[in-house]
């Protein structure tokens, strides 16, 4: 999370962890560090936090983002969190961007969008800036890693 690990050892670690399967304690520790370093979106009241885990292996559409639109249209505020595709065909950010929305909104801007549109999109690179070190490795590996599990546990809206 600090850029101190070179890409090859990081790739080896992520592959080994994926092969053995992360323990609850390992996932918890990763999530705690991610949340400590993450930006946030202030909001009042309850919001549904929704994020997919990426790479459904069935090459379908982006289900979590579509679910967010439906939930929001039903009157329930949604704080959607996601990224570009890493291990699937279409990441949440790819879909949101294709619809013409701006991705790089800060917490206050997303709070205003949430209040006005009942849904906001928190682009992971804006809120999890430390992930810039793991991003290229994840993309090069092209397989699911522990980071796919961490998205839902590190939502910037709380």
Q: What is the predicted function of each stretch?
A:
Residues 14, 61-117:
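A glycine-rich phosphate/pyrophosphate-binding beta-strand-loop-alpha-helix module
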Residues 50, 78-82, 103-107, 121-123, ...:
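General beta-strand structural signal in soluble alpha/beta enzymes
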Residues 52-57, 82-88, 127:
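Acidic, glycine-rich active-site loops and adjacent beta-strand->loop/helix elements
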Residues 4-11, 21-28, 61, 65, ...:
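Electropositive phosphate-/nucleotide-binding environments in soluble metabolic enzymes
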Residues 1-59, 70, 78:
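Acidic, glycine/proline-rich low-complexity segments that act as flexible tails and inter-domain linkers
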Residues 109-158:
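Phosphate/diphosphate-binding glycine-rich loops and adjacent basic-rich segments that engage nucleotide
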Residues 6, 55-58, 94, 145, ...:
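Short, flexible micro-motifs
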Residues 48-49, 83-84, 154-155:
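Conserved catalytic-core motifs characterized by acidic clusters
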């Amino acid at each position: 999370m600090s850029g101190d690990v070179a890409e090859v050892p990081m790739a080896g670690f992520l592959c080994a962890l994926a092969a053995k399967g992360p323990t609850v304690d390992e996932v918890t520790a990763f999530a705690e560090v991610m949340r400590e370093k993450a930006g946030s979106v202030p909001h009042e009241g309850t919001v549904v936090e929704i994020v997919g885990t990426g790479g459904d292996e069935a090459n379908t559409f982006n289900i979590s983002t579509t679910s967010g639109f439906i939930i929001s249209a039903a009157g329930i505020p949604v704080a959607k969190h996601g990224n570009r595709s890493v291990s699937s065909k279409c990441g949440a950010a790819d879909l949101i961007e294709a619809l013409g929305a701006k991705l790089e909104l800060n917490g206050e801007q997303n709070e205003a969008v949430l209040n006005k549109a009942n849904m906001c999109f928190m682009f992971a690179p804006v809120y999890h800036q430390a992930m810039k070190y793991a991003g290229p490795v994840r993309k090069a590996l092209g397989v699911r890693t522990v980071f796919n599990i961490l998205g839902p546990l590190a939502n910037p809206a709380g």
